[in-house]
């Protein structure tokens, strides 16, 4: 399902044909360094097939494939809270290193957030960022996020 089409990119649901490009672009240590440990590295075709299969099984679209020139080059994903936090969602994203610093991530993120608000009952979206990932902080600020707190010594990546 296509969600948004712009000059620079398309946002859509993940498709089986995206396995090769997902594997190619996500098998990057620089990206892995900024994601949660649940993301395997190295990233294999089997990892990609499992991710795409799980994304397609969900009843509500929560993983948006970023497509440039017909190639899947990134993801914007939402994870809903449970119980009393069910109207909250955490957003996470990555884009192929080849497309860093081109403005695609912030524009696509804004579109994905708008779509998610319009098609779910979520009323609050938040994000967490490693303190060293200044580029991701700028992306979030561009789309209107405000820093509401700092979790000191709350998570560790690579030791």
Language-model features, listed with the residues they occupy:
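Acyl-donor (CoA/ACP) binding surface of acyl/acetyltransferases
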Residues: 1-20, 24-30, 63-159
């Amino acid at each position: 399902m296509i969600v948004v089409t712009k000059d620079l990119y398309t946002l859509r649901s993940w498709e089986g044909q995206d396995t090769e490009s997902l594997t190619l672009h996500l098998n990057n240590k620089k990206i892995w360094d900024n994601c949660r440990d649940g993301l395997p590295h190295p990233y294999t075709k089997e990892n990609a097939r499992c991710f795409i299969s799980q994304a397609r099984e969900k009843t509500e679209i929560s993983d948006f494939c970023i497509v440039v020139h017909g190639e899947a080059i990134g993801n914007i994903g939402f994870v809903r809270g449970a119980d009393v936090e069910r109207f909250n969602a955490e957003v996470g994203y990555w884009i192929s290193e080849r497309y860093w610093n081109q403005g695609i991530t912030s524009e696509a993120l804004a579109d994905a957030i708008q779509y998610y608000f319009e098609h779910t009952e979520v009323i609050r979206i938040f994000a967490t960022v490693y303190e060293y990932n200044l580029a991701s902080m700028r992306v979030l600020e561009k789309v209107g996020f405000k820093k509401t707190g700092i979790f000191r010594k709350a998570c560790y990546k690579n030791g």
